[in-house]
């Protein structure tokens, strides 16, 4: 679940607010008998957000199959994975931080409205605590993962009896974070703590970029900082996955038909995007 991406959910989830006349970007890859649409999604959004537009609707109607990041993101599966891979009762989180960092974590937990406050965070591994700190205030502000674009697309295509296929599994996505070295995990948590007060401003900038269909702005606001400050995280969360998905698209081009691929908008922005990875293997993705 790409909603487990860090730099806080703010940097990679690209949340969508109430918006009118939004035109998120859409790309297409074609050969003689195959059409593949690429669409960037947001994973949390308020119930009254409207992101459909005619070109997007036509692409969805024409598509026979939907690919999303994962399909096994039901609450029971996610809860089991988080319990297995995200908790660490033997090593309290505050014991892994300096005294000043632990104090800031307590303050941020209360400010973000984390249920249970520091007691809840203290039994989490650093990656899960970082994600929790990022997600809690967004959910409190009315952002709902059940209303996310990917969820809506899955429901729409399922209702039309069209296949919905996952590019990854929930465990694969969670392990992107859970398998990181502890030092990288702690760096992620410290980044989330450091940037906590900037979240509202950055979120507003990201929203505007997504609504405008501006991948350069998405990269500038939401990805460039990770690329510069957390290069290992950037490679694992974005570059390696983008490369894998480009290879998957290349294989899908060998089969006739029309396919719609919806992944987090951050994967379709920046110098290492899916489109760039496709270009490296001789495949052009054209903006619609």
PLM ranges: what are they?
Residues 1, 21-24:
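Absolute protein N-terminus
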Residues 1-9:
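Bacterial N-terminal signal peptides that target proteins for export
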Residues 13-14:
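Hydrophobic alpha-helical transmembrane segments of integral membrane proteins
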Residues 17-19:
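N-terminal signal peptide c-region/cleavage motif recognized by signal peptidases
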Residues 23-233, 237:
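Structured, acidic catalytic/metal-binding patches in enzyme active sites
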Residues 232-288:
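A cross-kingdom marker for long, charged
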């Amino acid at each position: 679940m790409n909603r487990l991406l860090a730099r806080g959910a703010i940097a990679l989830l690209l949340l969508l607010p109430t918006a009118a006349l939004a035109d998120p970007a859409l790309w297409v890859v074609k050969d003689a008998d195959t059409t593949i649409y690429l669409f960037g999604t947001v994973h949390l959004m308020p119930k009254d957000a409207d992101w459909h537009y005619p070109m997007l609707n036509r692409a969805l109607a024409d598509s026979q199959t939907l690919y999303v990041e994962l399909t096994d993101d039901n609450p029971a599966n996610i809860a089991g994975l988080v319990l297995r891979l995200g908790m660490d009762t033997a090593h309290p989180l505050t014991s892994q931080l300096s005294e000043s960092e632990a104090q800031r974590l307590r303050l941020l937990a209360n400010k973000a409205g984390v249920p249970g406050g520091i007691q809840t965070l203290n039994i989490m591994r650093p990656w899960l605590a970082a994600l929790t700190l990022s997600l809690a205030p967004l959910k409190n502000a009315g952002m709902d993962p059940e209303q996310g674009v990917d969820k809506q697309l899955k429901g729409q295509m399922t209702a039309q009896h069209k296949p919905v296929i996952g590019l990854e599994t929930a465990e694969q996505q969670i392990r992107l974070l859970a398998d990181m070295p502890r030092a990288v995990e702690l760096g992620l948590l410290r980044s989330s703590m450091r940037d906590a007060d900037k979240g509202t401003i950055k979120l507003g900038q990201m929203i505007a970029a997504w609504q405008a269909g501006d991948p350069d702005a998405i990269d500038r606001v939401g990805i460039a900082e990770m690329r510069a400050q957390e290069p290992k995280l950037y490679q694992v969360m974005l570059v390696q996955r983008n490369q894998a998905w480009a290879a998957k698209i290349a294989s899908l081009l060998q089969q006739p038909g029309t396919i719609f691929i919806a992944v987090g908008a951050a994967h379709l922005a920046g110098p290492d995007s899916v489109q760039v990875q496709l270009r490296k293997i001789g495949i052009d993705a054209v903006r619609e």
